[in-house]
């Protein structure tokens, strides 16, 4: 699942500068894993 999430996150990280999008996503991915 992490690989799938990373693939959709990487392009967005470059678009949205990352921090505001990556932090809530990581919190949502932790319980899933």
From Swiss-Prot:
Q: Which GO terms describe its biological process?
A: pyrimidine nucleobase biosynthetic process; pyrimidine nucleotide biosynthetic process
Disulfide bond entries: none
Sorted keywords for this record are: Leader peptide, Pyrimidine biosynthesis
Sorted alphabetically, which Pfam families does this protein's record hold?
PyrBI_leader
Question: Which regions form coiled coils?
Answer: none
The keyword Nucleus is assigned to this record: no
- On whether Thylakoid is a keyword of this UniProt record, the answer is no
Which NCBIfam families did the record assign?
A: PRK10224.1
What protein name is recorded for this chain? Answer: pyr operon leader peptide
Organism taxonomic ancestry: Bacteria, Pseudomonadati, Pseudomonadota, Gammaproteobacteria, Enterobacterales
Gene behind this protein: pyrL
């Amino acid at each position: 699942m992490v690989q799938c999430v990373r693939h959709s996150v990487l392009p967005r990280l470059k678009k949205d500068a990352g921090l505001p999008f990556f932090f809530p996503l990581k919190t949502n991915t932790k319980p899933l894993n």
